[in-house]
Amino acid sequence: MKQAFRVALGFFLLWASVLHAEVRIEITQGVDTARPIGVVPFKWAGPGAAPEDIGGIVAADLRNSGKFNPLDTSRLPQQPATASEVTPPAWTALGIDAVVVGQVQPSAAGSYVVSYQLVDTSGNPGSILAQNQFKVARKWLRYAAHTASDETFEKLTGIKGAFRTRIAYVVQTNGGQYRYELRVADYDGFNQTPVHRSPQPLMSPAWSPDGSKLAYVTFESGRSALVIQTLDSGAIRQVASFPQHNGAPAFSPDGSKLAFVLSKTGNMNLYVMDLGSGQVRQVTEGRSNNTEPSWFPDSQTLAYTSDQGGRPQVYKTNINGGTPQRLSWEGSQNQNADVSPDGKFLVMVSTNNGAQHIAKLDLATNAVQVLTDTFLDETPSVAPNGTMVIYSATQGLGSVLQLVSTDGRFKARLPATDGQVKNPAWSPYL
C-alpha cells in the first residue's frame, strides 16, 4: 500500500537550523518482561552501505516504549525482507508472534523508498497486519522509520504511537557568550536544533497543543519574564513581566489559555491568561505558595504544587473557583506534577526518606508507583500517548535527561555532549 509521506511543518523548518551535537539514548534497564517481537534489519537494495539503519530505529522505538522486547539481531532465525519470505514456525518457536520486515532502495533525485510490513506469525502462512511505503529525502529517513514504528505500535497495542514527537529542553554550556540554549530534538535525541540562545538563564519550556509554539521563562531583561516563541518564524512575544517571580507556563489542552505563576502579591500563586484577549485572572490565593501548574484534559482544572499543608504536595483546583483537593498523600513531599494526556494519572517528583524520584500516581485508585532510581530527579514530562516519561537527573557534577516507560520496565539515559541538560518538555503529536 502506498501513501504520500506527510511531514510536520515544524520538523521541516527546524531542520533548516544548524545541528548541534546529538543527545543519544543509552539503555540503563531493559525490558525482558515485555512482549517479544522480531524486527529484521531492513534490506538495502542500493550500492555501498545503507544510508540509515531503519530496522535498528524501529527496534529502538519499540523497546523505548517499554511494551516490546525486540529480539537481538544475533538471535534472528532468518532475515526476510518481505512478508512472503517469513517462515512463521521459525519465529513462533522463539515465542514471537509478530515480525517487522522491510527494505530501503534508492530512487530518483537522491531520494529513497522505504517499505515495511508487519507480519502476524501465529498462522502459517503469516498474515500482514500493517504495511506502508514512503518516498523521502535522505534527511527524512529517520522520520520514515519513526512512522513505521508508530503504525506498528498502534496496530499491536491499540495506542497511538509517539515516536514522531519531539522534546524541548534547556542546555547550560560551560562557556561562551550564550551559555543557555533552548533546544528541540526528536524524542530520542536525534536532530537536535537550537531555538533560542541567551547569556541569561532560560527555564520551563512548554509546548502549545498544536506544537507550533513554546512558552518559556527568560531573564534577558534583568528579571524573569514569560515569553511565547513561534517555532517556524522565531518570533518571540512577551506575555508577562510582573514584579518579582514570573514562571512555570503551561498551555491549556484546547490552546485558549496559558497558566503560569506570579509572586507580585508576595507569595507565589497561579494565574491564567486568556490568549485571545490577554486578560489575566488569579486562580489561587492565601499565604501558601502555589506553583507548577499542569492542566487536566478539560482545560478547566489544574494540578499544582502547594505548601498549604506545610510541605509541598500536589493539589488540583478548578480555575473558575472551588475548594482545592489534595491529590498526593504518600511521601514526605510531592511536587512538579505532569498530568497524563488522558487525565488518568500524573507523574511527579516524590521525596521519601531523603530520596527524590519520579513517581506515577493513579488518579482513580491513588496507587503510587516509583518509576526511577536515579539521583535528584526533576521535571517529569509525559509523552502524548502516556507510555513514556522524560525527566532530568543529576549525574556527577551535571544533569542529564532520562527516559522511563510509565510501567517502569524500560529506562534509558540521553547523555548530553556539550553541557548540562534540564527542563525537558515532551511535545504533543506532530
Curated annotation (Swiss-Prot):
Pfam families: PD40 (PF07676), TolB_N (PF04052)
Broad class of the protein's primary localization: periplasm
Location(s), subcellular: Periplasm
GO cellular component: periplasmic space
Known role: Part of the Tol-Pal system, which plays a role in outer membrane invagination during cell division and is important for maintaining outer membrane integrity. TolB occupies a key intermediary position in the Tol-Pal system because it communicates directly with both membrane-embedded components, Pal in the outer membrane and TolA in the inner membrane.
HAMAP family in the record: TolB
Similarity field: Belongs to the TolB family.
Protein name: Tol-Pal system protein TolB
Species the sequence originates in: Sodalis glossinidius (strain morsitans)
